[in-house]
């Protein structure tokens, strides 16, 4: 009986809050938000080997940009957009309907998989076009796989770029 009550309580909490409890509190959207789009990303995180600003004898891999295709399903069959940095180096998502949104990071949380890039909460800084993403205010990146920066660069790697494959799910929210 106790197990059934616990299940009902968890289910009720999910329905009422509208948010997945596996998402850390630090990257949850405000309760006043409404989900407008969910997409699956497959692409790369690009890193470049640079001199460590804290230790000039050391070289590190520095994040340069994301490049990913966005799909309607988790099998990556129907291409619906792309993800990249805009000219101002803001993460941007653009759909095949011509709408796009750029954002800045608000908060991050470690992914459950230590080899995966962090989960993020981002806030829109601008939108373009008319369509799916026009009303977007918040973006979540969750369920990441891969994409993590390599351990350490080295002098022979200075200036070189590497691409690390990743997948993620992106959720876009507007105000209710």
Where are these regions (language model features)?
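Sec-dependent signal peptide recognition
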Residues: 2-8
């Amino acid at each position: 009986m106790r197990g059934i009550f616990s299940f009902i309580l968890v289910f009720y909490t999910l329905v009422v809050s509208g948010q997945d409890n596996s998402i850390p509190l630090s990257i949850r959207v405000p309760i006043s938000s409404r989900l407008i789009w969910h997409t699956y990303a497959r692409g790369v995180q690009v890193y470049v080997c640079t001199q460590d600003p804290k230790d000039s004898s050391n070289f590190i891999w520095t994040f340069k940009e994301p490049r990913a295709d966005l799909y309607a399903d988790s099998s990556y069959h129907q291409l619906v957009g792309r993800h990249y940095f805009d000219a101002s180096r803001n993460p941007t998502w653009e759909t095949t309907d011509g709408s796009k949104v750029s954002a800045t990071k608000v908060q991050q949380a470690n992914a459950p998989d230590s080899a995966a890039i962090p989960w993020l909460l981002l806030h829109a800084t601008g939108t373009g076009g008319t369509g799916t993403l026009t009303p977007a205010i918040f973006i979540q990146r969750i369920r990441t796989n891969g994409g993590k920066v390599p351990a350490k660069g080295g002098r022979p790697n200075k200036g070189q770029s590497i691409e690390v494959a990743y997948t993620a799910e992106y959720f876009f929210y507007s105000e209710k």
